[in-house]
Amino acid sequence: MTTRLRARRARALFLWRSLLPGGVERTAITLVDHLQASGWSFFLGLLEPHGDFRAWTRHPRRLLSPRWGPRTERQEENLGFALRAIPRLGWYAVRAQALLNRVKPNLLFTHSGVDVLVAGALARRRGAVWIARVGSDAFSDISEKHPWGRPVFKRFLSAAYRRPDHIVAASEGLRRRLTEDLGVSSARVSVIPNPVDVARIQEEARRPPAEYATGDFVLGVGRLTSNKGFDLLIRAAARLFRNERPIRLIILGDGEEREPLRALARELGIEHLVTLPGYEPSPWRLMSRAVALVAPSRQEGFSNVIVEAMACGAPVVATDCHGPREIVNTGVNGTVVPVGDEEALARGLEELLREPERRARYREAALRRAQEFAVARVSDRYMSLFRDLATP
């Protein structure tokens, strides 16, 4: 039976691995900062002592970071990542227990990952309500890369997702994955999108752009991993080049695919059109000036980048993944194309490039759509869920 929260003076601990740059991490900081005004005490506890996003918080005293411990470099959460995390579970258990002892939370909110299993088990012993956030389709991602392990991984995830008292899915597609494929009761799953600090992003977007962001360009933003599909974007740009519609391409982010992407651009003869400057702490100043933002992911549970680009007025071309298809309305505020189809991606981008009226229409609609994910609106939905778990 779900443990009930006390409606007054409730204490909530958000437990995250680290604050390395990423959508999951920005979601945590944005929520914890905004929810401070709710009357509850919210804390963000980290299992690892690093992350550039620590500077993003407006409430540093509510950020609980260890001074030492293991450091995991940002990478895709695949089967190899999960296996490599096993030796760190002892540290995670010690760290999680220390945070629980310090905060004494009534509610524990975590993202999904191996650390969650440890933290959730500890929270059970303290009597805290455990809510897990699922923001990516780990089942599809790992099953496609390791089909031989699909049955075992399905059983593992099914068992893991039964343990939280409640689950928040970042999109309707993720909710269906949990309930239809992994056997999670629909009564235990809510759909709440990621929050976006629209006002703060629009303020940042007015800052001068980086020196390399001059002229017309198409923008990609994200971790440079296979899952993000930036190789498809480069191939699409090469098609446009061959069709005598060259466009400059800027891809922001770091990751193991950075050099392979450079090599691909050289191989396709468009190295002079592709810029890979690395991690950019303020991508919004480029989003506001881009001809279009392209999100070519192979898997995407939500997509903070798409909503942030919309908040900056950037027209969007995205692939038909769980999150993007629920954010982008083709022909209204952007274009959605099939996953993995570089020809369709090139075609969708070319249509935007040759139709300035369409770009202008998308910009206006995108600005309106972004407001639906504004942090005030989304955090109200989270607080409603938290209060539903509280004793009247």
What is the meaning of each model-derived region?
Residues 14-22, 28-30, 34-83, 188:
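N-terminal strand-loop element at the rim of the active site
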Residues 25-30, 216-239, 249, 256-263, ...:
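A conserved mid-protein helix/loop that constitutes part of the nucleotide-sugar donor-binding site
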Residues 90-92, 129, 139-163:
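Nucleotide-sugar donor phosphate/pyrophosphate-binding loop at the beta->alpha transition
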Residues 110-116, 134:
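Short His-centered aromatic/hydrophobic patch
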Residues 173, 195:
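Carbohydrate-associated surface elements
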Residues 279, 298:
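Aromatic "clamp/platform" in nucleotide-sugar-dependent glycosyltransferases that forms part
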Residues 315-318:
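Short hydrophobic beta-strand element within catalytic cores of glycosyltransferases
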Residues 330-331, 335-342, 351-356, 371:
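Conserved acidic donor-binding segment of nucleotide-sugar-dependent glycosyltransferases
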